[in-house]
Swiss-Prot record:
PANTHER family attached to this UniProt entry: D-XYLONATE DEHYDRATASE (PTHR43661), D-XYLONATE DEHYDRATASE YAGF-RELATED (PTHR43661:SF3)
Family, per entry: Belongs to the IlvD/Edd family.
Gene Ontology BP annotations: isoleucine biosynthetic process; L-valine biosynthetic process
Protein name: Dihydroxy-acid dehydratase
Chain's role: Functions in the biosynthesis of branched-chain amino acids. Catalyzes the dehydration of (2R,3R)-2,3-dihydroxy-3-methylpentanoate (2,3-dihydroxy-3-methylvalerate) into 2-oxo-3-methylpentanoate (2-oxo-3-methylvalerate) and of (2R)-2,3-dihydroxy-3-methylbutanoate (2,3-dihydroxyisovalerate) into 2-oxo-3-methylbutanoate (2-oxoisovalerate), the penultimate precursor to L-isoleucine and L-valine, respectively.
Keywords, ordered alphabetically: 2Fe-2S, Amino-acid biosynthesis, Branched-chain amino acid biosynthesis, Iron, Iron-sulfur, Lyase, Magnesium, Metal-binding
Pathway(s) it belongs to: Amino-acid biosynthesis; L-isoleucine biosynthesis; L-isoleucine from 2-oxobutanoate: step 3/4; Amino-acid biosynthesis; L-valine biosynthesis; L-valine from pyruvate: step 3/4
Entry-linked InterPro entries: Dihydro-acid_dehy_C, DihydroxyA_deHydtase, DiOHA_6PGluconate_deHydtase_CS, ILV_EDD_C, ILV_EDD_N, IlvD/EDD_N
Record: active site: S517
Highest taxon in the source lineage: Bacteria
GO MF term set: 2 iron, 2 sulfur cluster binding; dihydroxy-acid dehydratase activity; magnesium ion binding
Organism expressing this protein natively: Hyphomonas neptunium (strain ATCC 15444)
Length: 613
């Protein structure tokens, strides 16, 4: 038996004062022997993925208390990357992940909570909470707010499914009228929930299922659908069972690290590669593993990327497939089932809901189960009504998408490609690696060579693209945008969207030590490590240097000799205080908080986590 953490503050004569304070929160004598479970919410009216979470914490809390626990809710911050995009607000997005992780750790440890339910949804909130869970290593259940419904726009006589990225691209398209852009804007984000494609938020909530830390349906059941309520209720009941198993039964295998082992991380990245998830997920998985002392590195991701097929393509990789379509095809367990049959998963790992992944697949993979409740779950469809309310509709599809040859989810035999949707590249400008979402790269440019167009900020890149100073065949280099150099490792969604708008999406490459939105597609290579600000070779490139990209062979190099690089490095170092900084000072406000972040953060190959002093 493992002592309950909460008894530190609820038992013993010396804790009379603490108990007095607990009583002031509503606890009574009968509560002091029960587990105290933190309900970690992230409600905010700033973010559509979180606007509907206000009452859901108390929904979970009631289930916890009905099952024999004491629930205590608190909130953490949530940044909307789409609203923060394209201005200095984006400097705060990635650093907010560390603030979220710290705040959860601080609250849970300060109050000696025994376990937690994490109610997350959008880009940095899920990974931030997961980092905290890995630090704390207590029982945890993740339940997200769910995906947004895809928007619908009638363009050129055709009804198209659209999302936030379409609005951004069309706004920069000179061929679109103001009225057409307005139509995209008003319909791109029709409901509450995380943006509807396989962007970072949805990618992370899907990976939570593969890690074993979330219930089936977590990543794909729409925020608006009535079926999602059952996930929240079940999460509240299940955390009490896990907590008692851990403390009273001594089962350490149900803690966060007990579930999220190295094998589970490998399952998660295998899913990520198979579904062409956001490149940000690589950053977050590396960070989570580091916080949990799991030996999972970029080398593991590189190894698995070479042998994992691409089984699912979702927006932004393709136009008309969104999370609601993945759900109809069986959701994440539909993809995991195909990976399992292909021998690409370790099905012996535990999950929060079954003793092994094999058992979970037998129950939740629509290709093998006849359970009508499971089939009913994956028939949950979009309602098509603008709303900010959770569980506000109960519409259902007439049938499931079980076509594994040409459907949304493919079998390994009928894969979109034999190697998957994410790749790690190495070379003389990325000695510690960089990443690319291959699911969004046209086959014609998997090998690409062209002259470098050097930009020392995202703003400079946007200006050059919009002023048509980037032409077909160019390789746009955006540097000094890494975790330290930005600081904050901004997402480069606007430059990639503008390349598309200028009809250069299949004609140019973009390389950066920054990162990309989950909405990015095209030959967009990010996370270049080491970054320019720490002496990376990307900082030594000159305008016109020929850059060679070879995704099939996982290489990225500048046609610059080692001797020339050494000469350039010596010249850079000789600049003293001006070395490894943009040539011209950028009009960028860097607060004290961001300076502190920059002083301690590691590069992307390490997950951009803070390094120990």
């Amino acid at each position: 038996m493992i002592p309950y953490r909460s008894r530190t503050s609820t038992h013993g004569r010396n804790m009379a004062g603490a108990r007095g304070l607990w009583r002031a929160t509503g606890m009574t004598d009968s509560d002091f022997g029960k587990p105290i479970i933190a309900v970690v919410n992230s409600f905010t009216q700033f973010v559509p993925g979180h606007v509907h979470l206000k009452d859901l914490g108390q929904l979970v809390a009631r289930e916890i208390e009905a099952a024999g626990g004491v629930a205590k809710e608190f909130n953490t911050i949530a940044v909307d990357d789409g609203i923060a995009m394209g201005h200095d607000g984006m400097l705060y997005s990635l650093p907010s992940r560390e603030i979220i992780a710290d705040s959860v750790e601080y609250m849970v440890n300060a109050h000696c909570a025994d376990a937690m339910v994490c109610i997350s949804n959008c880009d940095k909130i899920t990974p931030g909470m997961m980092m905290a869970a890995m630090r704390l290593d207590i029982p945890v259940v993740f339940v997200s707010g769910g995906p947004m419904e895809a928007g619908k726009v009638n363009i050129d006589g055709e009804l198209r499914a659209v999302d936030l990225i379409d609005a951004m691209i069309e706004a920069a398209n000179p061929d679109r009228t103001d009225a057409e852009v307005d139509e995209f804007e008003k319909n791109a984000c029709p409901t509450c929930g995380s943006c509807s494609g396989m962007f970072t938020a949805n990618s992370m909530n899907c990976l939570a299922e593969a890690l074993g830390l979330a219930l089936p349906g977590n990543g794909s059941t729409l925020a608006t659908h009535a079926d999602r309520e059952a996930l929240f209720r079940r999460a509240g009941r299940r955390i009490v069972e896990l907590t008692k198993a851990y403390y009273e039964g001594g089962d350490t295998g149900v803690s966060a690290r007990g579930i999220a082992t190295k094998a589970a991380f490998e399952n998660a990245i295998t899913l990520d590669i198979a579904m062409g998830g956001s490149t940000n997920t690589i950053l977050h998985l590396l960070a989570m593993a580091r916080e949990g002392e799991v030996d999972f590195t970029l080398a593991d991701i590189d190894r698995l990327s070479r042998v994992t097929p691409c089984l699912c393509k979702v927006a932004p990789a393709v136009q008309n497939v969104h999370m609601e379509d993945v759900h109809r095809a069986g959701g994440i367990f539909g993809i995991l089932g195909e990976l399992g049959r292909a021998g690409k998963l370790d099905t012996s790992v535990r999950t929060i809901h079954e003793d092994t992944m094999a058992e979970a697949l037998s129950k939740w993979d629509i290709a093998v189960t006849n359970n009508p409740e499971v089939q009913e779950l994956f028939l949950a469809a979009p309602g098509g009504v603008r709303t900010t309310q959770a569980f506000s509709q109960a519409r259902r599809y007439k049938d499931l998408d079980t076509d594994r040859e040409k459907g949304v989810i493919r079998s390994a035999k009928h894969a979109f490609s034999k190697d998957g949707g994410l790749a790690v590249l190495f070379g003389n400008i990325a000695e510690m690696g960089c990443v690319v979402k291959t699911a969004g790269v046209d086959d014609s440019i998997l090998k690409f060579s062209g002259p470098a167009v050097i930009c020392e900020s995202q703003e400079e890149a946007c200006e050059r693209i919009l002023k048509k100073r980037v032409k077909a065949g160019d390789v746009v280099i955006i540097r000094y945008e890494g975790p330290r150099g930005g600081p904050g490792m901004q997402e480069m969604l606007y430059p990639t969207s503008y390349l598309k708008a200028m009809q250069l999406g299949k004609e140019c490459a973009l390389i950066t030590d920054g990162r990309f939105s989950g909405g990015t597609s095209g030959l967009s290579i990010g996370h270049v490590s080491p970054e320019a600000a720490e002496g990376g070779a990307i900082g030594l490139l000159h305008e016109g240097d020929i850059i060679e990209i070879d995704i099939p062979n996982r290489t990225i190099n500048a046609k610059v000799s080692a001797e020339e690089f050494a000469k350039r490095r010596a010249e850079m170092d000789a600049k003293g205080a001006a070395a490894w900084k943009p040539v011209e000072e950028r009009p960028r406000k860097v607060s004290r908080a961001l300076k502190v972040y920059a002083a301690h953060v590691g590069n992307a190959s390490l997950g951009a986590v803070r390094l120990d002093p």
